[in-house]
């Protein structure tokens, strides 16, 4: 049994403030794309969970979000059976595409079917929130505004490219650790994010500009300011 794990991009991302708990409040427009990894699963009659990869990994399997997602679901719903998991990894690490989070979300969807739990999306999203800020969105994917640390989601009508519009995602061979990206990023406050949301919502209603037009014409990412000087290849 297989499950595709579509990655995501941020068509808009603004770092609003740093919180007292050390995390950052964001305003972002999430969009899944048609590229991603694939998670496969084979049912085990015992309760063991195994994980293998198509390429060598530099970290213990127990720290992988795929393994953590399987263990979390097994524990939360007292599943008596196990699973052999296989991750076909094609998305690059440290690229900001949410590859690991997408893999975790795909694992939850996959095991929901394999273990015949029949859980609604809402239950999967509750589990996903315990795995990482991006994971709840990637349970369903599509298009959504996200706030807080990324966990406060407002789904919107799915964005569709027009026939004459194309989106190319380029990932240079220069991984950027999350800690480095946040180190020098400016905190803008809420004004830019609120103005973006207002402009997006008015697109297609009070203006001839459609939502996808507005999104593509207003691509923005706060991390460019902190990342480009240290990672010129990304720029």
Regions found by a protein language model. Name each.
Residues 140, 145-235:
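Conserved, helical-rich catalytic subdomain that frames metal- and/or nucleotide-binding sites
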Residues 1-95, 113, 117-122, 159-161, ...:
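ATP-binding N-lobe of GHMP and related small-molecule kinases
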Residues 27, 64, 102, 225-228, ...:
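A generic "alpha-helical surface" signal
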Residues 4, 19, 55, 59, ...:
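Alpha-helix initiation/capping motif
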Residues 78-151:
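Gly/Ser-rich oxyanion-binding loop with an adjacent helix/lid
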């Amino acid at each position: 049994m297989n499950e595709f794990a579509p990655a995501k991009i941020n068509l808009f991302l603004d770092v609003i403030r740093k919180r007292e708990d050390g995390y950052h409040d964001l305003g972002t427009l999430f969009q899944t794309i048609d590229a991603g990894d694939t998670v496969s699963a084979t049912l085990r009659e015992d309760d063991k969970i195994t994980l293998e990869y198509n390429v060598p990994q530099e970290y213990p399997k127990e720290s992988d979000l795929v393994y953590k997602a399987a263990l979390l679901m097994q524990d939360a719903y007292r599943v008596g059976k196990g699973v052999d998991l296989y991750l076909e990894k094609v998305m690059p690490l440290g690229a900001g595409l949410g590859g690991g989070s997408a893999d975790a979300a795909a694992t939850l969807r996959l095991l929901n079917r394999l273990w015949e739990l029949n859980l609604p999306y809402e239950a999967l999203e509750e589990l996903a929130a315990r795995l990482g800020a991006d994971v709840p969105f990637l349970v369903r994917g599509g298009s959504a505004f996200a706030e807080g640390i990324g966990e406060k989601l407002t789904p919107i009508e799915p964005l569709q490219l027009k026939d004459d519009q194309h989106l190319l995602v380029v990932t240079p061979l220069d991984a950027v650790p999350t800690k480095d990206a946040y180190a020098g990023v400016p905190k803008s406050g809420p004004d830019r994010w609120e103005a973006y949301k207002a402009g997006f919502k008015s697109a297609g209603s009070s203006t001839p500009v459609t939502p996808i037009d507005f999104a593509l014409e207003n691509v923005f990412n706060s991390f460019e300011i902190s990342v480009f000087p240290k990672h010129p290849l990304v720029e």
